[in-house]
A protein has these predicted regions:
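Surface-exposed, interaction-prone regions used to assemble/regulate multi-protein complexes
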Residues: 23-216
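Accessible peptide chain termini
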Residues: 1-2, 23
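Short, Lys/Arg-enriched N-terminal segments with co-localized hydrophobic residues
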Residues: 10-22
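Short hydrophobic transmembrane-like helices used for membrane targeting/insertion
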Residues: 2-3, 7, 12
Length: 216
């Protein structure tokens, strides 16, 4: 598995390169600009959501767009090259920003690929929950890293909840579920980080943070 291979490499490097004793602390939470945009749509009418049609599964690649009060906001999942837990790695990172109509088109150009799909909502956004995961990585010498990141968001309207999340640190697919309790479709955090090399392990936690309770 990918995690096992890279973490095993990190463990060997940590033994051979004794001069580098830094613990990596990687923070990929939402930026203030993302939080401000999320706050803005609470109390507003969510007219519709635009995403890829569910062709290969219930996900949209890289982007989901939200039409709110004649404005458009977008949940993006883009790769960033990071000095990650076990070395240089491309890691997918969420953002939530205002965008233009031209930015809402699917990333695909193949005619056989999924087409954009617009789902009508026409409900008031009552609350937004940010899902943050924290991974504390250990080897035989102790903790060597911590990775805190946005796993997804839940948008609560008058009648439903809409949940958007990613399933791996490296992929750019945004999974989508809706209903009364859509987060039951999300994978457990421990199942996503359970493939460490011998001598390595992680302590994992997931937090659900209401947008109204975030203090600047």
């Amino acid at each position: 598995m990918i995690i096992a291979e890279f973490v095993h490499t990190a463990f060997i490097l940590s033994k051979n390169q004794k001069e580098d004793k830094r613990m990596k602390n990687i923070n990929k939470k939402f930026a203030k600009e993302d939080i401000d945009c999320l706050r803005f749509i609470v109390g507003k009418k969510l007219s519709s959501i635009k995403h890829d049609e569910f062709f290969w599964g219930n996900f949209s690649t890289s982007k989901v767009s939200f039409y709110v009060d004649s404005q458009i906001f977008q949940l993006r999942l883009k790769e960033e090259s990071l000095d990650f837990l076990w070395g240089e790695e491309d890691v997918s990172v969420f953002s939530f920003q205002k965008c233009e109509e031209k930015d809402t088109n699917t990333i695909y150009i193949d005619e056989k690929a999924p087409k954009p799909l617009i789902t009508k909502i026409d409900e008031i956004v009552k609350n937004i929950i940010i899902i943050e995961d924290t991974i504390k990585a250990f080897n035989q010498e102790g903790q060597f890293g911590q990775f805190t990141y946005v796993f997804g968001i839940i948008i609560k309207t008058e009648n439903k909840e809409y949940c958007f999340w990613k399933e791996n640190y490296f992929e750019d697919d945004i999974y989508i579920a809706k209903g009364q309790n859509p987060k039951e479709n999300m994978p457990d955090i421990d199942s996503l980080w359970n493939d460490w090399a011998p001598g390595c392990y992680s302590e994992n936690s997931r937090n659900y943070i209401e947008i109204s309770k975030i203090v600047e």
